[in-house]
């Protein structure tokens, strides 16, 4: 079986980009802008588990590294962190905010 997906990655300044780039190249991934790739991934049973194990075998990751994938499953678009977790967005506070009134009940 196979699926197509977008992968976003943030390995920081000391990350194993060489290992990740070799893995992406081995999977004929296409570059889609800064730290984003598009690829087709072949798997036998459980795509996410196999993908996570495959990347972990080829890329030296630490606890701060993040890899997020976006794929289609059963006519829905899904996204999930394979490694790492969501951080506070850098754009928080730049948009128009409603004025909040503090009052005592």
Please give the residue ranges for each predicted region:
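Phosphate-ester processing/binding pockets and catalytic centers
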Residues: 1-3, 14-105
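Active-site-flanking beta-strand signature of metal-NTP-handling nucleotidyl enzymes
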Residues: 5-9
């Amino acid at each position: 079986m196979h699926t197509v997906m977008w992968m976003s990655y943030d390995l920081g300044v000391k990350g194993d980009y060489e290992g990740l780039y070799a893995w992406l190249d081995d999977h004929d991934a296409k570059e889609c802008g800064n730290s984003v790739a598009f690829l087709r991934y072949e798997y036998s049973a459980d795509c996410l588990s196999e993908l996570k194990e495959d990347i972990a075998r080829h890329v030296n990751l630490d606890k701060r590294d993040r890899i997020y994938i976006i794929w289609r499953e059963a006519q829905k678009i899904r996204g999930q962190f394979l490694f790492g977790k969501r951080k506070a967005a850098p754009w928080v506070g730049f948009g128009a905010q409603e004025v909040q009134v503090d009052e005592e009940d």
